């Protein structure tokens, strides 16, 4: 038995009611939509948030905040991600070639998350105080 072969037991599910197939079915002619009106027509429905012409809530409330465009180009790198890089000197190019950073990233900051036990040299990256202490405790160094 596999997840993609699971089926309900035979007879446990009713077949869906076919709509608009004659008056004997009970759902013929108007097909359960009633007579006239917006919701009886094909494609006819009110959009989400429509309040009958009253100014909708999402337009009554003020706009707020913004999306930082800098966030596209700045990334955080954890210490345990640095440990996976097979290079003595870890810089932006080494992180990109190890598929830790995307190609759009222009600067990165090393943060204290996880642990590192091999000595590496971090060059050209911003490093937090805690991460700097952990790198130096493991025998590595940080170059600006």
Curated annotation (Swiss-Prot):
Keywords: Ribonucleoprotein, Ribosomal protein, RNA-binding, rRNA-binding. One of its GO terms (cellular component) is cytosolic large ribosomal subunit. Residues 21-31 have a biased composition (Gly residues). Residues 1-57 are annotated as: Disordered. One of its GO terms (biological process) is translation. PANTHER family: 50S RIBOSOMAL PROTEIN L15 (PTHR12934), LARGE RIBOSOMAL SUBUNIT PROTEIN UL15M (PTHR12934:SF11). Part of the 50S ribosomal subunit. Binds to the 23S rRNA. This is Large ribosomal subunit protein uL15. It comes from Marinomonas sp. (strain MWYL1). The gene is rplO.
């Amino acid at each position: 038995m596999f997840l993609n072969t699971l089926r309900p037991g035979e007879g446990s599910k009713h077949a869906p009611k076919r709509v608009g197939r004659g008056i004997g079915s009970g759902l013929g002619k108007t097909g359960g939509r009633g007579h006239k009106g917006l919701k009886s027509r094909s494609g006819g429905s009110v959009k989400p948030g429509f309040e009958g012409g009253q100014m909708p809530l999402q337009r009554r409330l003020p706009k707020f905040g913004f999306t930082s465009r800098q966030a596209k180009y700045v990334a955080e790198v954890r210490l345990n991600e640095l440990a996976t890089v097979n290079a003595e000197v870890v810089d932006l190019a080494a992180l990109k070639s190890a598929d830790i950073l995307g190609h759009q990233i222009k600067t990165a900051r090393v943060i204290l998350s996880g642990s590192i036990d091999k000595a590496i040299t971090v060059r050209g990256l911003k490093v937090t105080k805690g991460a700097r202490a952990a790198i130096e405790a493991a025998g590595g160094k940080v170059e600006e």
